[in-house]
């Protein structure tokens, strides 16, 4: 098989949503319909022995939430699908942001009862900024929900993109009868309890004018007919170019927990979602079909297998072909990486990988050699851009009861910090480490993982700082003068980038006014080399 052929059959996408919209359930059902698993994990009954395939971390199983990104690969209809299930909790949106830099499309899940929620909107803004194509799945039609016309209007108005319904619901809640497929002009009938693999086939009705059909579904069908006529007259025609530009979204309705509407979404991902495209590096644009391998680390996960205390670097292949045993260079350090134990994923389950192509996600065992946003090549000096680190919005100090466990604490925080799940800052003065995060749950997860994965009982307490800005200057001497004058407010992050800490935004404003030669940044990119200026 040629590289061109293999690239064309790749589909790499992320599933995004507000917490509790049903994202993890839909992930499970996509795996089920693609034949990757034979029984979907029960997301609802988390205390049972069966858990969602994509929720592998112990705290996820205990609390029934996704706090880490999972990667799953499967084959369906001749295509290789790389599915990335992102954290559902808003405190982990930074991890989700990085995942979105590794995909070519996104599947947005909306709770039909709640519409477009805050986390959904934030993630969609990221997709829009990157012109990522978006397919929308309106979930939970088997419950009492909002009027579908209102939902469509809200999606269009809030997200600022044209909406093209591909299916339309007939009723909802206890009177949910199915969906009408507007492209194929047929109705798929819903049956309660369709949550078993052997029940995934649905009854199809092609003639909605049949008196028996009208009698069977009554007023709900009549209302759906009127809405369908309205949609046909008002909704724009589907435009593949507009979809690929992130300006138009196909919309599907269904109930993921009942396996209903999932098949249509999976088929549309194969038919309409784009194969891997060009990727921007500082030096030039990289074509996916280039012969030489290139890839970027978008995620690092510690302790995927706690028995081995391992760390895996998740790499999005941007061009060329991966071959087991090939020599890859880490552009940042110039060091070579061994590739004899590179793996592919089905969540925490992995298999040794012989070959992979642009668009695929591979896992490279990492012993500190790789960092987030590292570029890997066959020798070319390239640096991919767009993988961000955001300034924390909450700070806490961390201490341990047993000083003899200090080494384990440092190891744990170093590895968890490399994941990007938490940011660890070393103060210029003093020895108490600072943890920075965008949400409180991140601290809970870190203390839980320190205890269960590193054997460290850690205590966190609110710090006096609430804001941070990375600082740079054109003149190194000026930056050193600023650091010397503000030693009590300076800390260094995982890549030793100097950071100014503040309790109030006014303190940053004063510093900016008093030090015009210093730049204050809300965001940094790889190794502290690229910054976005903002106060």
Curated annotation (Swiss-Prot):
Principal location class: cytoplasm
Molecular function as annotated in GO: GTP binding; GTPase activity; translation release factor activity, codon nonspecific; translation release factor activity, codon specific
Localization in the cell: Cytoplasm
A cellular component annotation (GO) from this entry: cytosol
Keywords: Cytoplasm, GTP-binding, Nucleotide-binding, Protein biosynthesis
UniProt KW Cytoplasm keyword: yes
Keyword Cytoplasm: yes
Span of domain tr-type G: 8-277
Database matches in Pfam families: EF-G_D2, GTP_EFTU, RF3_C
Binding site for GTP: 17-24, 85-89, 139-142
Gene Ontology BP terms: regulation of translational termination
Top-level taxon in the UniProt lineage: Bacteria
Function noted in UniProt: Increases the formation of ribosomal termination complexes and stimulates activities of RF-1 and RF-2. It binds guanine nucleotides and has strong preference for UGA stop codons. It may interact directly with the ribosome. The stimulation of RF-1 and RF-2 is significantly reduced by GTP and GDP, but not by GMP.
Matching HAMAP family: Rel_fac_3 (MF_00072)
Name of the protein in its database record: Peptide chain release factor 3
Species for this entry: Nitrosomonas eutropha (strain DSM 101675 / C91 / Nm57)
């Amino acid at each position: 098989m040629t590289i061109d052929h293999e690239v064309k059959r790749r589909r790499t996408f992320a599933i995004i949503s507000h917490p509790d919209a049903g994202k993890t359930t839909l992930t499970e059902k996509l795996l089920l319909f693609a034949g990757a698993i034979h029984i979907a994990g029960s997301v609802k009954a988390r205390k049972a022995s069966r858990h969602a395939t994509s929720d592998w971390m112990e705290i996820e199983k205990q609390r029934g939430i996704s706090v880490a990104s999972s990667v799953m690969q499967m084959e369906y209809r001749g295509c290789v699908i790389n599915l990335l299930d992102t954290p559902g909790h808003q405190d982990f949106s930074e991890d989700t942001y990085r995942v979105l830099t590794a995909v070519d499309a996104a599947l947005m899940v909306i709770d039909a009862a709640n519409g477009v929620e805050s986390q959904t909107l934030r993630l969609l803004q990221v997709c829009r900024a990157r012109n990522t194509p978006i397919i929308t799945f309106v979930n939970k039609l088997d419950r009492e929900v909002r009027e579908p016309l209102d939902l469509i209007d809200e999606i269009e108005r809030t997200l600022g993109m044209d909406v093209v319904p591909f299916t339309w619901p007939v009723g909802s809640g206890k009177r949910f009868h199915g969906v009408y497929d507007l492209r194929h002009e047929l109705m798929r009938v819903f049956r309660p309890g369709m949550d078993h693999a052997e029940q995934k086939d649905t009854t199809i009705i092609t003639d909605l004018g049949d008196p028996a059909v009208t009698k069977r579904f009554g007023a709900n069908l009549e209302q759906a007919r009127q809405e369908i006529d309205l949609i046909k007259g008002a909704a724009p025609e589907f435009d593949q170019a507009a979809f690929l530009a992130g300006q138009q979204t196909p919309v599907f309705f269904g109930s993921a927990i009942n396996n209903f509407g999932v098949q249509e979404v999976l088929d549309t991902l194969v038919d309409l979602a784009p194969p891997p495209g060009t990727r921007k590096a500082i030096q030039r644009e990289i074509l996916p079909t280039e012969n030489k391998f290139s890839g970027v680390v978008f995620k690092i996960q510690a302790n995927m297998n706690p028995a081995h205390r391992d760390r895996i670097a998740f790499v999005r292949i941007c061009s060329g072909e991966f071959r087991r045993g090939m020599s890859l260079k880490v552009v940042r350090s110039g060091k070579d990486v061994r590739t004899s134990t590179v793996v592919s994923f089905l969540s925490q389950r992995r298999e040794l990988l012989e070959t992979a192509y642009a668009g695929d996600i591979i896992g490279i065992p990492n012993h500190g050699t790789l960092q987030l946003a590292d570029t890997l090549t066959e020798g070319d000096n390239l640096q991919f851009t767009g993988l961000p680190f955001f300034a924390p919005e909450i700070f806490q100090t961390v201490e341990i009861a047993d000083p003899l466990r200090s080494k384990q604490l440092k190891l744990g925080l170093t590895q968890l910090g490399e994941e990007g799940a938490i940011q660890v800052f070393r103060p210029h003065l003093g020895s108490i480490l600072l943890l920075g995060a965008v949400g409180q749950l991140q601290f809970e997860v870190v203390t839980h993982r320190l205890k269960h994965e590193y054997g460290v009982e850690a205590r966190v307490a609110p710090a006096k700082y609430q804001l941070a800005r990375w600082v740079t200057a054109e003149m190194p001497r000026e930056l050193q003068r600023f650091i010397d004058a503000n030693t009590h407010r300076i800390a260094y992050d995982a890549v030793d980038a100097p950071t100014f800490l503040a309790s109030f935004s006014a303190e940053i404003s004063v510093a900016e006014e008093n030090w015009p030669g210093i730049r204050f940044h809300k965001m940094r990119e790889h190794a502290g080399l690229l910054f976005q200026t903002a106060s």
